[in-house]
């Protein structure tokens, strides 16, 4: 009994221990079981020991055999429990593994069933789509047959009918005359703008279908379903890009030549491609398959034909008024950029609706064309709307419900299946005619108001637009003719002028031209020296820095050692140093600059060697003459200092005078231009001033012949001869002035004589004290240098004025005029190159005569072509 009791106590302790162990503590299953068994065993042993000690008073238990037996029994039980728990653990692991395998098989089976179900649904969907496509094709075929049958009931197009497509709208004579007008405008370099027409409207409103109907050819740019097109229902069609159809008149192509221009956005199409009309749709589809979004880069298609006027039709992307805001805004931005140029005609295309309030294009266009002055409205799918009316009152009310004062047309176009089936030009035109006739038949049944007949159908719309195009070119004819006549008059005037020049090449006339030019040249030169703004100082004048930079090495002042002399014009008070001057004022500034340089010149250092050598021995008392030394040194230093400055002064003075020839030429050219525009530089009418002589105070230049002065460009040798005479005189005047200036440098003896008139007792008489000697001589030399500098500066400026500037204003006239007057007839002919000039004038006359004859022929041909082109055409204006 004690053994079982101990076991029960051990179990109680084990249970208590398990309850006290935290649940969050992680222990492996085997370890936990072993610990539990060991605890149970220890508990049993302790309990046994406790019982033994308690019953120790009993004699039967005093030998201690019972505790040994209980210990062995507990070990066996512990081992047994361990085995049982190991078996349970293995069994649970096997069960878990089996459960995982079963779960995996179950998932695989479920996935297989789902795949089977998806495959079945896919097959069902394919079958459904195939059936739907077949049904749709059958419905389309049925609708096409119904549409064709409905159109065929309207009868065939009469070959003699006046219904023409765009390529046969005008007679051949009109296209031929138009080609000639274009040729004349190019030959005359007169730009003629080509009309541009933009088709705009909501998506699926029929813009591109209307373009095809307007042209009268199935260009296959429209499609739906499996046919990719511009304006069809296919969202991947050309409607994502703007399409320019550029029609060009070219007499070389009887059959229209279609060229798709290079596409910079797609590398595959970076070159022009020539295609047939049948291949146009395929090529456009390829381009748009590579376009993922709406882009502003357009597609350009050139269509050249002998029977077309130059115009451009622009097909825009369809507007989306009820779609996402981002996409709609992008399309509106592209379309608005197309409509914004004010020279473009706008064709607003919109599907008909019995409720005018639901029409959206009117409000949209008013944002761009507020007065709707260049907008025309075309309402498509008119047949479906007409079938909804049952009374005359309702149909007339509908037709009169358009916005007042707008140009509107109602059209019905064959659907794309019919257009694809009848793409041949005549058959396509016939279907358009039948659709129009069907509309008119329905309107006749309703007894509509005949006033609206001119607004119904493609033919009135085509006539209306082409007449606008024709009238735009007709309006350019007077401008081209005016330009032609202006060129003809210019050619006649040039020819007359050449004939006058040729007849004037005699000695008397040449002498008159020579005298007139010489007088004009000398007079302008004198005015530029005296002071005048006629030479345009802002353009022809020079600042002090510009004057020096233009002269190069001679521009900067240098001393005797070729070192540049720094000048601060502002500090040295040089007048007008930053102003643009020429002539006399520029020479005055040069003289002021020369004076400033001289005034700031200092005597160079005097060395003792020079003093000792220059002093010498006085012949009277053998005492050194330091006054003589100072005079000699001052004479040498002043010559070395001022001679380079005088030479530079003369060089720059010659440069200023030589500049006057170019300025005089510009003044003469300015006066000639003033006469050409009917004015004179002296005021009033040029001819009146010239013929008025001196009675009104006009100087001699006013008596010059306009013809003589205007023809001076023909005689460059003579004008150069006059300028060379002027340059020679300037050189001689500058040379004489320089020689006069050199007289200012006195000899040492002259300076000494002047100095000894006022002897200075401060000069030392003993040569032993070198420092005192040098100081005294330097002071005297400096005093002498300052006196000489003042005298030279003053006298040089006076001589420059008297011997250089004054002769330019007096002797220049007499000398040059005398040399020109004394020229013999042979010399004049040589200077004027009479023989070469006559040959040149003959060639120019011949050339100008050919030009005049050409313009006369063009004038005659142009008038004939304009007469053929300006045939009377009806220009219907649709009623409101």
Curated annotation (Swiss-Prot):
Segments for region (Disordered): 1-124, 532-551
Composition bias, Polar residues: 22-31, 532-543
The protein, known as: Dynamin-like protein A
UniProt subcellular location: Cytoplasm; Cleavage furrow
Any Gene Ontology biological process: protein localization to cleavage furrow
Organism of origin: Dictyostelium discoideum
Family recorded in the similarity comment: Belongs to the TRAFAC class dynamin-like GTPase superfamily. Dynamin/Fzo/YdjA family.
Annotated region (G2 motif), positions in chain: 227-240
Keywords: Cell cycle, Cell division, Coiled coil, Cytoplasm, GTP-binding, Hydrolase, Motor protein, Nucleotide-binding
Biased composition annotated in UniProt, kind: Basic and acidic residues: 8-20, 77-94, 103-124
Binding site for GTP: 201-208, 315-319, 380-383
GO cellular component: cleavage furrow; cytoplasm; membrane; microtubule; midbody; phagocytic cup
Compositional bias per record (Low complexity), positions renumbered to this chain: 32-68
Catalytic activity: GTP + H2O = GDP + phosphate + H(+)
UniProt-annotated stretches for the region G5 motif: 413-416
GO MF, any single term: microtubule binding
InterPro entries, alphabetized: Dynamin, Dynamin_GTPase, Dynamin_N, G_DYNAMIN_dom, P-loop_NTPase
Keyword Coiled coil set for record: yes
Principal localisation: cytoplasm
Sequence ranges assigned to domain Dynamin-type G in this UniProt record: 191-478
EC code: 3.6.5.5
Mutant phenotype after disruption: Produced cells are larger and a large amount of them contains more than 2 nuclei.
Ranges in a coiled coil: 69-152, 479-509, 824-861
Chain positions covered by the region annotation G4 motif: 380-383
């Amino acid at each position: 009994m004690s053994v079982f009791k101990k076991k029960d106590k051990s179990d109680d302790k084990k249970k208590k221990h398990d309850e006290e162990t935290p649940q969050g503590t992680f222990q492996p299953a085997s370890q936990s079981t072993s610990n539990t068994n060991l605890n149970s065993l220890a508990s049993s042993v302790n309990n046994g020991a406790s019982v033994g000690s308690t019953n120790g008073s009993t004699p039967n238990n005093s030998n201690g055999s019972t505790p040994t037996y209980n210990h062995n029994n507990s070990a066996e039980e512990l081992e047994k429990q361990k085995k049982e728990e190991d078996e349970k653990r293995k069994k649970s692991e096997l069960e878990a593994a089996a459960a995982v395998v079963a779960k995996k098989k179950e998932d695989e089976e479920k996935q297989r069933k789902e795949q089977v179900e998806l495959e079945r649904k896919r097959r069902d969907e394919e079958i459904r789509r195939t059936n739907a496509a077949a049904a749709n094709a059958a419905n389309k075929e049925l609708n096409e047959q119904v549409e064709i049958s409905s159109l065929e009931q309207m009868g065939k197009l009469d070959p003699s009918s006046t219904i023409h497509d765009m390529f046969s709208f005008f007679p051949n004579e009109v296209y031929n005359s138009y080609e000639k007008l274009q040729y004349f405008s190019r030959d005359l370099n007169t730009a003629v703008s080509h009309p541009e027409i933009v088709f705009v409207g909501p998506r699926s409103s029929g813009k591109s279908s209307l373009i095809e109907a307007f042209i009268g050819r199935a260009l296959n740019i429209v499609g739906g379903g499996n046919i990719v097109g511009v304006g069809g229902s296919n969202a991947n069609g050309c409607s994502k890009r703007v399409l320019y159809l550029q029609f060009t008149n070219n007499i070389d192509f009887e059959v229209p030549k279609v060229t798709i221009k290079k596409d910079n956005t797609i590398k595959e199409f970076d070159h022009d491609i020539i295609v047939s009309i049948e291949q146009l749709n395929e090529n456009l589809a390829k381009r748009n398959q590579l376009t993922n979004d709406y882009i502003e880069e357009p597609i350009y298609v050139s269509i050249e034909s002998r029977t077309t006027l130059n115009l451009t039709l622009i097909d825009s992307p369809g507007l989306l008024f009820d779609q996402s805001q981002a996409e709609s805004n992008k399309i509106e931005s592209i379309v608005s950029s197309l409509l914004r140029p004010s020279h473009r005609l706008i064709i607003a295309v919109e599907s008909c609706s019995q409720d005018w309030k639901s029409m959206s294009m009117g409000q949209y266009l008013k944002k761009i064309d507020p007065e709707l002055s260049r907008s025309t409205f075309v309402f498509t799918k008119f047949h479906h709307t007409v079938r909804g009316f049952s009374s005359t009152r309702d149909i007339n009310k509908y037709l009169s419900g358009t916005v007042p004062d707008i140009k509107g047309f109602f059209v019905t176009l064959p659907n794309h299946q019919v257009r694809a089936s009848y793409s041949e030009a005549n058959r396509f035109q016939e279907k358009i005619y039948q659709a129009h006739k069907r509309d008119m038949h329905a309107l006749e049944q309703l007894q509509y108001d005949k006033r609206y007949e001119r607004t119904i159908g493609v033919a009135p719309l085509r006539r209306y637009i082409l007449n606008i195009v024709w009238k735009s070119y007709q309006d350019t004819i007077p401008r081209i003719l005016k330009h032609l006549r202006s060129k003809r008059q210019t050619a006649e005037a040039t020819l007359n002028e050449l004939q006058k020049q040729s007849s004037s090449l005699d000695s008397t006339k040449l002498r008159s031209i020579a005298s007139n030019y010489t007088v004009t040249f000398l007079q302008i030169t004198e005015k530029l020296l005296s002071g005048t703004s006629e030479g345009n100082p802002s353009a022809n004048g020079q600042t002090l820095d510009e004057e020096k930079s233009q002269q190069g090495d001679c521009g900067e002042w240098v001393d005797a050692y070729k070192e540049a002399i720094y000048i601060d014009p502002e500090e040295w008070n040089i007048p007008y140093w930053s102003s643009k001057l020429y002539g006399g004022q520029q020479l005055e500034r040069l003289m002021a600059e020369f004076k400033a340089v001289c005034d700031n010149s200092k005597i160079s250092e005097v060395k003792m060697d020079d003093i000792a050598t220059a002093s010498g021995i006085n012949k009277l008392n053998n005492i050194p003459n330091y006054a003589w030394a100072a005079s000699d040194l001052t004479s040498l230093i002043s010559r070395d200092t001022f001679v380079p400055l005088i030479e530079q002064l003369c060089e720059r003075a010659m440069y200023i005078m030589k500049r006057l020839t170019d300025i005089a030429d510009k003044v003469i050219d300015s006066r000639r231009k003033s006469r050409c525009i009917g004015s004179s530089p002296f005021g009033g009418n040029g001819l009146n001033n010239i013929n008025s002589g001196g009675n009104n105070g006009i100087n001699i230049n006013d008596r010059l012949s306009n013809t003589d002065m205007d023809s001076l460009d023909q005689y460059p040798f003579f004008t150069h001869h006059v300028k060379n005479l002027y340059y020679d005189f300037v050189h001689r005047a500058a040379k004489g002035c320089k020689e006069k200036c050199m007289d200012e440098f006195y000899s040492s003896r002259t300076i000494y004589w002047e100095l000894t008139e006022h002897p200075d007792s401060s000069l030392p008489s003993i040569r032993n004290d070198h420092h005192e000697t040098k100081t005294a001589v330097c002071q005297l030399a400096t005093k002498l240098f300052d006196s000489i500098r003042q005298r030279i500066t003053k006298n040089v400026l006076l001589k420059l004025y008297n011997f250089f500037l004054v002769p330019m204003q007096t002797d220049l006239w007499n000398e040059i005029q005398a040399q020109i007057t004394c020229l013999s007839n042979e010399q004049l002919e040589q200077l004027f190159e009479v023989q070469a000039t006559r040959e040149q004038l003959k060639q120019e006359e011949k050339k100008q005569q050919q030009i005049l004859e050409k313009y006369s022929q063009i004038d005659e041909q142009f008038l004939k072509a304009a007469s053929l082109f300006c045939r009377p055409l009806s220009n219907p204006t649709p009623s409101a």
